[in-house]
Amino acid sequence: MLARVGTTLFFLANALAAYAVSVTSPTRDTTWQSGQVNTVTWSSVSTDPEEMVIMLVNNAHYPNQNFNLGTVQSSAGSLDTDISISSDLPTDGWQIYFNGATSQNQGSLAQSEQFDFEGSDSTLAASTISGGIYSSTSASSTSSSTATPSSSSTTSSSSSSSSSTPISSSITSSISSSASSSVSSSSASSSGSISSADAKTVSASSNSTISGFSTSTTSASSSAAGNSSSSSYTSYSGAVSNGVAQLSVAACMGIAALMLIA
């Protein structure tokens, strides 16, 4: 007994789920123009079959007419048709049927209200139509999105800027600083003078006397260009003069001693 109740509820649930899809257009007040673009719209839920067969049906007149327009995704939400009907077919009492597309569910899922056709195509064979579904657009596909190439994304995400002083500039700056320091140091420690701002030449001289015996004179000059010159000379005139004077004094003292002895 419980098994039968469970089975009945199962099929009832499937039946209710199958009929969740609902046709919203065409309606009773709709008139399709034969041979022109006409639109079918519907709403669906996640429990509806993924695919549905679209049928154009007329059960209001005998013989009944059933035309298979094609299969669409139930999630599409709309489709366009370009159907023309032959001149012998009725212009009223038409409906759109949504049927199951699988062998497990081939029954009708939903039907539209009856609508009319206006016009016909006299070149068509009796009880025939031409055209059918020529486009089916999902409602969700109307939204658009743009994507950043990996390569651009990579370039954008990895792009950074850094500033560093070139090695040549650093070396030049260091050399200039050293040269400036050398010039300043030389000018501060010597009695020389900078003769030209452009040439940056430093000259210096010094004199020294050692014990009164010799005198040495040294002069030097240097430039920022890297050239330097120096000269030195030593004079012994002081030593010779002192020696002669001492000999003279000794001679005088010797003569005086001889005179006293005599």
Swiss-Prot record:
Subcellular location(s) per record: Golgi apparatus membrane; Cell membrane
Keyword Transit peptide: no
Keyword annotations of the record: Cell membrane, Glycoprotein, Golgi apparatus, GPI-anchor, Lipoprotein, Membrane, Signal
Positions of the propeptide removed during maturation: 243-262
Superkingdom of this protein's organism: Eukaryota
Region entry Disordered, spans: 136-165, 175-194
Signal peptide annotation: 1-20
Glycosylation sites: N207, N227
Membrane-protein topology: Lipid-anchor; GPI-anchor
Gene Ontology cellular-component terms listed: external side of plasma membrane; fungal-type cell wall; Golgi membrane
Annotated lipid attachment (GPI-like-anchor amidated asparagine): N242
A Pfam family it matches: Kre9_KNH
Keyword hit for Membrane: yes
PANTHER family: SERINE/THREONINE-RICH PROTEIN ADG2-RELATED (PTHR35185), UPF0619 GPI-ANCHORED MEMBRANE PROTEIN C1322.10 (PTHR35185:SF1)
Family: Belongs to the UPF0619 family.
Name this protein carries in UniProt: UPF0619 GPI-anchored membrane protein C1322.10
